[in-house]
């Protein structure tokens, strides 16, 4: 009887320690959860378009990360900082935003179709695609050449 109580108590402790950590989210192994979404940093060098295609091919509803708040921006910055593998191409990480018209104005939505509710620009010039910059600890958005291969983060 005493052993049964000990095992039950041990399971209760494990359950309580996991609640609130994101472990209760339905994220795949290797993905991190934050406020109902799952994120993963990929240490693959791809152009913006190839990175977006890679994300969508992983499963339905996956796209390059869209950042909707300062809280989410901070979460993504920490996730990238902790998971990026250092190479000469890690100065930038793609996010799901790019210019969609000939005047190079940004689209009014992220690559996943959600509206742009939060902005965190560091530069005004336009090179069509946006990413996070290591020099800002991945906290500011910078304009980048879409054809350059960089690491990226997918979100579902």
From Swiss-Prot:
Keywords: Disulfide bond, Hemostasis impairing toxin, Secreted, Signal, Toxin
Disulfide bond positions: 27-38, 55-154, 129-146
Domain C-type lectin: 34-155
Localization per record: Secreted
Signal peptide start and end residues: 1-23
Protein name as annotated: Snaclec A3
Subunit architecture: Heterodimer; disulfide-linked.
Upper classification of the organism: Eukaryota, Metazoa, Chordata, Craniata, Vertebrata
Entry GO MF terms: toxin activity
Function of the molecule: Interferes with one step of hemostasis (modulation of platelet aggregation, or coagulation cascade, for example).
Additional remarks: Shows greater sequence similarity to the alpha than beta subunits compared to other heterodimer snaclecs.
Family note: Belongs to the snaclec family.
Tissue expression notes: Expressed by the venom gland.
GO annotations of cellular component type: extracellular region
InterPro entries in the cross-refs: C-type_lectin-like, C-type_lectin-like/link_sf, C-type_lectin/snaclec_domain, C-type_lectin_CS, CTDL_fold
